[in-house]
């Protein structure tokens, strides 16, 4: 929203700048060229000639609305299944599942993995989609200060006691690359705690997929702990735009 002297004049409303021109690091705003710091097109693939060519060919072959409908009705295709297999192989996991978009994906994953008996331990700077997903969770949850591994261990001790009482499991949630600060989650240290605690690890790697690790395989690959991460959440919206 507006800052400085303009904040008082905004009456609480956000502004919506109108950018013009091709998506890129430099675009036109109010008749002059400006640097665009707001794009998610990390690798510039949205402008790549091969990507544009494939996009045009797919639109000509299948139309602009295909596949139309939810996957459980009329929206499932062999291309979905092929892409899921290729993505799973790329990041080193046995399987993958495509969802419509990132925010909904994380909320759905959390809701799918947890029951009211389960306990969650999560980083205080987890993305808003994680927080919204946790709001649907009716069980206990414990937060630890950002990247504070001593505090994370303490919360795992609390979570273990609660899980023993409820008969549930423990899910730890963190990010590979934190979107607000740009620092890395301490995945190697969290995975190491599995020697002392019984939990599953869900990593939101929206910003790390395509940019971190061997060949862009993500932050878990960067730390060499892919096998220790139980569920990887990635998105096409950042590096694959």
Predicted regions and their residues:
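Conserved N-terminal alpha-helix of the aminotransferase class I/II PLP-enzyme fold
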Residues: 53, 60-101
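Short, structured coil segments at secondary-structure junctions
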Residues: 116, 136-138, 197, 228
């Amino acid at each position: 929203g507006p800052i400085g002297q303009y904040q008082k004049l905004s009456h609480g409303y956000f502004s919506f700048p109108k950018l013009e021109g091709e998506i890129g690091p430099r675009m036109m705003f109010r008749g002059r060229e400006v640097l665009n710091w707001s794009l998610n097109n990390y690798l510039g693939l949205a402008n790549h000639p091969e990507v544009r060519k494939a996009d045009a060919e797919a639109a000509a072959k299948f139309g602009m609305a295909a596949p139309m409908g939810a996957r459980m009705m009329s929206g499932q295709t062999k291309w979905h299944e092929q892409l899921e297999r290729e993505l799973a192989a790329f990041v080193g996991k046995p399987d993958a599942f495509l969802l419509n978009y990132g925010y909904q994906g994380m909320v759905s994953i959390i809701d799918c993995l947890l029951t009211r008996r389960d306990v969650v331990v999560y980083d205080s700077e987890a993305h808003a989609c994680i927080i919204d997903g946790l709001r649907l969770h009716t069980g206990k949850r414990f937060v630890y200060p950002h990247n504070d591994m001593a505090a994370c261990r303490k919360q795992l001790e609390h979570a273990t006691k609660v899980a023993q009482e409820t008969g549930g499991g423990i899910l730890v949630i963190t990010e590979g690359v934190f979107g607000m600060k740009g620092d890395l989650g301490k995945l190697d240290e969290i995975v190491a705690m599995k020697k002392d605690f019984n939990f599953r690890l869900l990593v939101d790697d929206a910003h790390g997929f395509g940019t971190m690790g061997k060949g862009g395989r993500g932050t878990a690959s960067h730390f060499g702990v892919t096998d220790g991460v139980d569920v990887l959440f990635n998105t096409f919206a950042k590096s694959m735009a």
